Amino acid sequence: MKMAAARWAAMVVAAGLLAALVLLPTDLLPPARAALAIFGIAVILWTTTRLDAAWVAFAAAVALVPLQAADQRELMAMLGHNIIWLMAGAFVIGAAIQSSGLAARITGGIAAKARTTAQLFWLTTLALIPLTFLIPSTSGRAAAALPALALLPDDGADPRRRAFALLIPVVILVATSAALTGAGSHLLAQDLLDQRLGERFGFANWALWGLPFALASSALACAIILRMFLTADQRAAPIEVRAATDRPALSSGEWRVMVVAAATFALWFTTDLHGLEIATVAILAMIALTAPGIGVMSFKAGMKAVNWSLILFVGGAMLLGQALINTQAAGWLVDQLFTLVGIGGGSAAALPEIAVIAAIALISTASHLFLTSHVARTAALGPPFILMAQSAGIEPMAVLFIATMGMNYCLTLPACSKALLLFQDAPGGGFRPGDLLRLSALLAPLNLALMIVTYFAWWKWTGLAL
């Protein structure tokens, strides 16, 4: 009852603030006010209720039309956007990799080489990173990695298993930054950039910028978990060796999936050479993997593997972000939001580079505390970040990419990710919510600092200079 009352109180306060927000700016036209109001209502529902986040986003997108903040053609075009079909194809590719056993082979094969607990943790971290390119869903990657828990005892008394149950989802989440297809929010960020500036990150560029950061943040998380939750003796404790020879040879299905996946990644990395969009390549891969006699699953099974709820969530969020920009509501919002931290109204141009990077990193990293969805964070903060960059005369692509790296951080509460919930309640014992809070208290500021270091050591020199 107390929690319900607190939730209702939060909704009332938020609604009051929203009403003031919409009524106060007298210089906004009605469509901009409508877009701002719908956006505010969506954020309130995302943060204070248990309503399905995808339903909220989709309903918000539909509500834009009668209020003239978007037109019907934009709504229909949303459902046929190339990002929608890129995600659909990526889900089928991920399902094929997972169902064929290839994902488990990758993680299990590397982890089987471990002789001590510390080696197991480091090798598992290394094995999980490639899954970011293979399976587009964090919960899908978590499900594929769940069997790895069997490498440690499940008697409930071994702290190594508890730490291991924490390590796997944490690495899955921080490694999300490695690939453009690692999360739907990345594709949404690319669409926002395309809408505003006609620019795209591209699969290869994202890997160039995101993979080094993902490797560094994954290594940082592994090192902290080993030191924070295990003693030196526990880290050096031997584990039972699962020899790689115990695993069967590659099946014909695994071979077919490997060939299709390799061809897909090769085409994604060479888009500029052949001209095929990454969404088109994903659809071709989807057709190949579900083709009779060639694929490893039926077309019907492939469609069931697609997370249509997430896809509609991304579609609704895209239209919401587009409406904020087109109606000029985002321009007003960005001045209010970023003025609070000293980078609004173009003032970022006068600040030291390190101060701007730190402000972007702080805002984006902290956003997971009030918006638990990757896509919701990008929909809410993506347009303001782009407009802040434009008003300050700094590079929008760099600002949005760095902000996306910060928005990928979501490790404070289990509710922030299905991957965390899966390992918290893992059969045989998982981690405790307090473990995650302890970890995040140290990892969050270090991850923020890592973003700043990565900018000056790598991003700035590889095409992401402000």
Model-derived features: where do they sit?
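Membrane-interfacial loop-to-helix junctions in multi-pass transporters
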Residues: 9-10, 31-34, 80-84, 110-126, ...
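Flexible hinge motifs at transmembrane-helix junctions and intramembrane kinks/re-entrant loops
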Residues: 26-33, 40-58, 75, 223, ...
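Structural signature of hydrophobic alpha-helical transmembrane segments
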Residues: 22-37, 80-92, 139-141, 213-216, ...
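Hydrophobic transmembrane alpha-helices that form the pore/transport pathway of multi-pass ion
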Residues: 111-178, 184-197, 370-406, 429
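Alpha-helical transmembrane segments
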Residues: 7-19, 57, 118, 122-127, ...
